[in-house]
Regions:
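N-terminal helix-turn-helix DNA-binding module of bacterial transcription factors
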Residues: 1-69, 337-340
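Short beta-strand segments enriched in small/hydrophobic residues
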Residues: 20, 25-30, 64-80, 179, ...
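Short acidic/polar active-site loop segments enriched in Thr and Asp
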Residues: 24, 70, 126, 186-187, ...
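Hinge/beta->alpha junction and helix N-cap segments in small-molecule ligand-binding domains
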Residues: 76-86, 104-112, 155, 165-175, ...
């Protein structure tokens, strides 16, 4: 009996692989399901046969065998922000080689609602990553009841027993404030993201504490959104009525870009009349005409740690949630002046 397999245009099956490798179809299934009870010699023969036939195991069939869907949900706001699109790209880069598929939901809401979590759960995801966003009480309850692994990225939250990975925003804001004070600034504004996120709360706390220690009380706080429009509109209104502001700390680089455009429109030169600091160090800063001083978040490391926690908790339902705060660094360019 010939071992030749019909290699026409149809897709190869596990039966074809078994025939070419000279093993049973059950053995082929065990190899692609991650089974351990297969010798290395047989495993190599099966993988070589699969490569020769360009065999791709059916994901749905594999999930029935392993009881794993190999799907991870990720929910975020404002994908138009280059920071979040970079985050999504890095998550895909980390998870795809491991065989995981990302199910992405871009929320248009300031607060993630219960139905948005429910939508991801319909895909039988093994875990959900929630980026810098607030969860409604209903969404929090839905996650808890589902028993699905959930990891918070770029924030943490009280009341949700989940692991979290984020940049140490408190420390970052302290270092930014210290630098600005040492550069001679005394009249500040902080244009932030949404008011109640851990990100905004920690940055404001760290920034204010440094100013208070230096007996500086002149700080205008403007909550906003992480958008160009928020930065532009906030700065235009602020600088029109208060010409004494000499430094604006922005909750994101995109906010900072809006701030600088508005400042120029109302007659401020940067950095001669107004210093501006961003947050994130997005890639586009390398090719914009704005050499923005900013805080760089260690995105690659943050995503890697998030994926490691996610996979560990998927495999071990009794794993204890961890909170990981990572340090970034101040990137000094040309939007902050030294005051005499």
């Amino acid at each position: 009996m010939s071992n030749k397999v019909n290699q026409g245009k149809r897709n190869a099956t596990s039966e074809d692989v078994a025939q070419l490798a000279g093993v049973s179809q059950a053995t082929v299934s065990r190899v692609f399901a991650g089974g351990a009870n297969v010798s290395e010699k047989k495993r190599k023969k099966i993988l070589d046969a699969a490569a020769q036939l360009e065999y791709k195991p059916n994901a749905q069939a594999r999930s029935l065998i392993t009881r794993k869907t190999m799907m991870v949900g990720i929910i975020m706001r404002n994908i138009r922000d280059p920071f979040y699109s970079a985050v999504l790209e890095i998550f895909h880069t980390r998870l795809s080689p491991l065989g995981y598929q990302l199910i992405f939901n871009n929320s248009e809401n300031e607060i993630i609602e219960e139905w948005e979590i429910a939508k991801l759960l319909e895909y039988n995801v093994e875990g959900i990553i929630v980026t810098d966003a607030l969860l409604s009480e209903g969404a929090t309850r839905k996650l808890k009841r589902s028993g699905i692994v959930s990891i918070l990225f770029n924030r943490y939250a009280e009341g949700l027993n989940s692991s979290a990975v984020y940049c140490d925003n408190y420390l970052a804001a302290q270092q930014i404030a210290t630098y600005l004070v040492e550069m001679g600034h005394r009249t500040f504004a902080f244009i932030s993201g949404p008011r109640n996120t851990s990100t905004t709360v920690d940055r404001l706390k760290g920034f204010q504490e440094v100013l208070w220690e230096r007996k500086i009380k002149d700080l205008t706080i403007i909550p906003g959104t992480y958008s160009y429009e928020s930065g532009f509109e906030s700065a235009q209104e602020l600088l029109t009525r208060n010409k004494k502001i000499d430094c604006i700390f922005c909750g994101s680089d995109i906010i900072a870009l809006g701030v600088m455009d508005a400042a120029r429109l109302v007659g401020f030169r940067i950095p001669e009349d107004l210093s501006v600091v961003g947050f994130d160090n997005i890639r586009m800063l390398g090719w914009t005409p704005y050499p923005l001083t900013t805080w760089e978040q260690p995105l690659e490391e943050m995503v890697t740690s998030t994926v490691e926690l996610l996979l560990k908790e998927i495999d071990d339902k009794n794993a204890v949630p961890r909170i990981i705060a990572m340090k970034g660094r101040l990137v000094i360019r040309n939007t902050v002046r030294k005051k005499k």
